[in-house]
């Protein structure tokens, strides 16, 4: 089953009220707590970590996102988007028109980050500050189309942080509900069409369920376990960890398509966070590459140096 967002009235016409045992197909982010929780987790993980400086840098960017979210709320009428999107995700990155709000968000992020920046980070922020709107749009399009270049990787986390804020705000404004329908392409976010950063096996009311966390709009969509999140095959799956079988972070590899995605288990550690713990477990990525697998997800603070399919 794939996931589609439909207008509330259509859902009410076609479905009975939620039954016991119903699995929520889609979870929208709670932006009031998302960034503060992520920043806190990044700072926790940075302590005595080989990548501590970079995790601390990432925490600073996330804290800036929290401040900019508060100072620059998005006011946008998306009432017709669901009706116009058809089979596509309503905020499809391939076709949804970006407006100037994301430029405002980027400028605000730069303003928040510059006072504490130095060296290469400060130079990158200043270069972004000088960039024309056309240059920014071209770089944004390249990132969203997965056209990565090593020479632009220093700018990518900041541009993506602004784009992510923009899409996450829009996702929160969608006037509809999600339902599971027959279909394919479940490896892509049903809200915006981007790809996951990691998968989270949850606690609470969704205990034991796996949700893929979008690396752009921050939504999470249900994906059954013991099935490759990239090609949906289940015959050649293996699970890898650095510590033990009880590790809170594992890589799920697929011998059929040759890719892997990290899974974070809240039952093993309730503090795990989709972006933070994925970034802090880079050693596991190195191990998976040594085993011949390629990553099927992208962390917003760790972009490839070349384009991917």
UniProtKB/Swiss-Prot annotation:
Record keywords, A-Z: Cytoplasm
Primary localization: cytoplasm
Function statement: Necessary for formate dehydrogenase activity.
BP GO terms, sorted: protein maturation
Keyword ATP-binding applies: no
Xref: HAMAP family: FdeH
Disulfide bonds: none
InterPro entries reported in the protein's UniProt record: FdhE-like_sf (IPR024064), FdhE_C (IPR056796), FdhE_central (IPR056797), FdhE_N (IPR056774), Formate_DH_accessory (IPR006452)
Location within or outside the cell: Cytoplasm
PANTHER family (UniProt xref): PROTEIN FDHE
Gene Ontology molecular-function annotations: ferric iron binding
Family listed: Belongs to the FdhE family.
GO cellular component terms, A-Z: cytosol
Name of the protein in question: Protein FdhE homolog
